[in-house]
Amino acid sequence: VYESLLCSWDCMAKVGGRPVFERGQILQAISHSPHRPEAYNAMCLWLEFCGHRIPSSEEKYLTMYSYACIGISNILSNKDFEYYNRYDGYFAFLYYKAIAGWYIGKTQESKELFLELANNPNNNLNERYKILIKETIENMGISHLVKE
């Protein structure tokens, strides 16, 4: 059931135009298996791409920060799926915690997390995330702290 809900969300996200349904699928997945991290990652993605539907940006980023923290606390409960392949793992949670933290006033923590993402050789995020991390670090003015 859990994997089916995540696949349903992923399919609708690719089609587009049904963000309320998408969010509902993710919330059902969370309620089905709240100890698993994958649906929290899906919710962070949903907030990134559909979060403009939330009444205030503060609420959007507080929610994203919360889901990223919950995902991190459940990180060891992830399992491989047969079909669902959109789970980005630990470093994606750090990214969402960092970006959301910036917007809710946790600027020092945000900077530290972005530097950890940039400097950690185990960071296996895809190119989209790596570009966003690099651009954000440049915008924060902390590029000089990135190890080469």
Regions found by a protein language model. Give the residues of each.
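Structural motif corresponding to the intra-repeat A-B loop/turn of tetratricopeptide repeats
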Residues: 15-16, 50, 58, 104
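Conserved structural position within tetratricopeptide repeats
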Residues: 27-31, 66, 70-73, 119
